[in-house]
Amino acid sequence: CYMWVVRGGEDMHPVHLYNFKWTRSGKNVLEFLDGFEGCVLQSDGYSGYDSAVDFWNENHPEHMLAHSNCNIHARRYFADAVKATGSKTAKEAVKIYEEIFTAENKLRNLFNDKKISETDFLRLRQEKVKPVFEKFHSWLLEKQQTAAILNSSKTAEAINYCLKRWDKLTNYLDYSFLTPDTNAAERAVKPFVMARKNFLFSGSGIGARSTCFIFTLIETAKANSKNPEDYLRCLFEKAPYAQTDEDWKNLLPWNIELTPFKMRGEWVE
């Protein structure tokens, strides 16, 4: 059994969707994409995402999807090589990634603080970050042969992982709403993992889907800076009266008005 977590929505209104599936098949990804109106899917290097996006693009030529990969996963291969072999080449790759992430964070902070426009943000990425990636690519090609000759399997694996996915690791630069990694989605997994240590089981597929429903509400509320307890209370109070699509939209975390809790009745001794 698998819990799939999808993060999406607008920058200011993120949504965390939890989905229960019996398998890890790439067909599940196609189900998640059904009705998707976005332009890019960002994921780790799992091949199921590759096949799903390829299938989607073959069958939706009018709505092609770009596919971006996570640079943290790529960096992790080099970090693992450092731990396993102490490879100097892998250490150098980790340093290059730190340079990329540092530059990205500085630009993202300026953009989030509205000190630069979206146009300037994308332009500065091309000026500050893209050249580092280009040097990194040349460096990887140079080191690829050396790593193979030295039979540094961990380092060679890390280099090949990056080169194989190079376009998908760097195309995020063209989208202001994308970061170099999938950390935000990865962080959304942690609350479920921690909670599962307490409740242990969902009992059935229906129970697991109910768990997904509640986690979607709670974690989306938290992602939008809403107290989840207050949000759920107001949601459950107002949902029975929702009749139109507009009514339901007004119950989304970024639209709902959280009314103060009022105690009804009195305690009787």
Predicted feature descriptions by range:
Residues C1-E269:
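Catalytic center-proximal scaffold of phosphoryl-transfer enzymes
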